[in-house]
């Protein structure tokens, strides 16, 4: 029997496994944290009146888009073709978890900002509108507060649905990868959702 030892390593011939850098784990953690914040903030609205909540609890929804933006920036750094991101928003494919996730991420910003504005008291709305660069948006902040306050139940429902979608879609996306047998499971979506809730506010 002859033994052949091969010392070459060609990515065009030999199978390669791509190992994630720090960018993807950062996005997964911050995305799960944002999902937990959205879900708990939405559920808190039905259980605790605004008068019984601390200032931190009322301002908490604003943290979700900030955390998500940092996570998406990290994810963008991991992409090879960064200029092609816009193509996700040129179509919607019902059978594609990545397409669902792209549109969910887009809807999170108005939903979380609306819930945050609805939670503010009158004095806080005025203070927010007079702070630094937000002075240019003072009128929009006041209008957003009035609109979100009138439609509070709808805004809470949007945060709950989008938070659940954000928490579960990444697991569903990874679960469709047949090349990773350990990931190819229907349990991965609920697992990501529970993990996201565990990182949310207590």
Segments and roles (model prediction):
Residues 21, 28-32, 45-52, 57, ...:
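Long, contiguous internal "core" modules enriched in hydrophobic/ aromatic residues
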């Amino acid at each position: 029997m002859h033994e052949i030892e091969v010392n070459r390593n060609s990515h065009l011939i030999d199978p390669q496994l791509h190992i994630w850098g720090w960018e993807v784990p950062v996005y997964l953690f911050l995305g799960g944290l944002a999902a937990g914040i959205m879900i708990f903030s939405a559920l808190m609205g039905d259980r605790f009146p605004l008068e019984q909540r601390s200032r931190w609890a009322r301002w908490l929804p604003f943290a979700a888009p900030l955390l998500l933006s940092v996570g998406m920036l990290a994810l963008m750094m991991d992409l090879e073709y960064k200029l092609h991101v816009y193509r996700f928003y040129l179509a919607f494919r019902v059978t594609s978890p990545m397409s669902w996730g792209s549109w969910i991420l887009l809807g999170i910003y108005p939903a979380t900002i609306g819930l945050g504005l609805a939670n503010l008291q009158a004095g806080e709305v005025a203070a927010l509108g007079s702070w630094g660069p937000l002075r240019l948006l003072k009128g929009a902040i006041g209008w957003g507060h009035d609109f979100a306050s009138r439609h509070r139940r709808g805004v809470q429902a949007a945060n709950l649905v989008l938070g659940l979608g954000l928490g579960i879609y990444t697991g569903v996306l990874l679960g469709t990868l047949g090349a990773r047998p350990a990931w190819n499971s229907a349990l991965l979506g609920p697992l990501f959702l529970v993990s996201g809730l565990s990182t949310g506010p207590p």
